[in-house]
A protein has these predicted regions:
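Class I S-adenosyl-L-methionine
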Residues: 2, 65-74, 84-262
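SAM cofactor-binding core of SAM-dependent methyltransferases
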Residues: 6-63
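N-terminal Rossmann-like NAD(P) cofactor-binding module of classical short-chain dehydrogenase/reductase
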Residues: 9, 76-78, 118
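Short, structured active-site "lid" loops
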Residues: 46-82, 166
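Flexible, glycine- and charge-enriched loops at secondary-structure boundaries
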Residues: 55, 94-98, 270
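Nucleotide phosphate-binding/pyrophosphate-handling subdomain across enzymes
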Residues: 269-272, 279
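Short, hydrophobic alpha-helical segments
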Residues: 277-288
């Protein structure tokens, strides 16, 4: 069993999906979040208030984050730096995109020197990863492994493939380190062992099972017009199930996407983060590399 709680700094935190996933694997405490989006930072603050996330300060700008006060106090750096420069949904400008925050992420890694780095991004980052990110991590003294994971592997109804990267500063490891890594990797599936990025167990789609509805509870509805806010409010107060699953955008009550949906869309599925950490820890163990925590 783990002997202590490991401190993490979360960059480009989103709603804290990576941190929630890590909790399923090892005892961690987030000591600082870095998140520039005001609406998403508000979600983080709300989740801290509700007790879902660790209470910690939120720094708003990765570019101005001072690593000096945190040096030697952080065990793991986690983050999913912006995917827009590499996503197929955008222009894929890569390293030329001003939103590319890998150089700033690398600055934090050099300044903090965390024993372990755990990162996430879209598959479109692969070329940049092999040409820039992995070589730079190795130059910093890290052993690096990576894998392709999808939400469907953990039972979600959507694929949502993501690249996860696990980097470790130590290549030998003490007995305690080896035992700790074995704990992290316990219950994980065996990795493919191939070079480069491997697809870590595409298990196929999981068939969803919806609950049966008691039709006797329902009466015919005649929905109000799109602009009739009072009418919609009355109807949904009587039959809240009538509100679309894709909330607050299709029922005429608002013209914008709910901020929670934006946070979810940019975030990490916690179960996928947990699985990725277990599998990649197992890879490092097989290679003789053990997180020095």
């Amino acid at each position: 069993m783990a002997t202590r709680t490991y401190n993490t700094i979360s960059i480009c935190s989103g709603y804290g999906g990576i941190e929630l996933g890590l909790r399923e694997v090892i005892p961690v405490r987030t000591v600082c979040y870095v998140e520039i989006e005001v609406s998403v930072a508000a979600v983080l603050a709300a989740r801290m208030e509700e007790g879902y996330l660790d209470q910690a300060p939120i720094w708003t700008n990765l570019k101005t984050f001072d690593t000096e006060p945190w040096r030697g106090k952080v065990d793991i750096l986690t983050g999913g730096f912006p995917c827009q420069p590499f996503s197929v949904a955008g222009a894929q400008l890569g390293e030329d995109d001003p939103r590319n925050l890998w150089p700033d992420t690398a600055r934090l890694i050099r300044g903090l020197r965390p024993p372990v780095v755990f990162l996430e991004n879209v598959p479109g980052i692969l070329e940049y990863y092999f040409s820039t990110i992995r070589p730079e991590l190795r130059e910093m003294g890290y052993e690096v492994t990576e894998g392709l994971f999808s939400a469907s592997e953990t039972g979600a109804p959507h694929k949502r493939q993501r690249i996860f990267i696990l980097a470790d500063t130590d290549s030998s490891g003490s007995r305690q380190d080896r035992e700790q890594t074995q704990l992290w990797a316990s219950g994980s599936e065996q990795s493919s062992g191939t070079s480069g990025v491997s697809r870590e167990g595409e298990d196929g789609e999981v068939e969803g099972k919806g609950r049966e509805l008691d039709e006797s509870r329902y009466v015919p509805l005649y929905p109000p017009g799109p602009g009739d806010r009072d009418g919609w409010a009355l109807l949904l107060s009587i039959v809240p199930e009538a509100e679309p699953t894709f909330c607050r955008t299709l029922n005429g009550t608002t013209s914008g996407v709910d901020l929670r949906l934006r946070a979810i869309g940019n975030g990490v599925v916690p179960a996928v983060a947990a699985r990725a950490f277990r599998v990649l820890s197992e890879k490092l163990k097989k290679q003789g590399n053990f997180p020095k925590l």
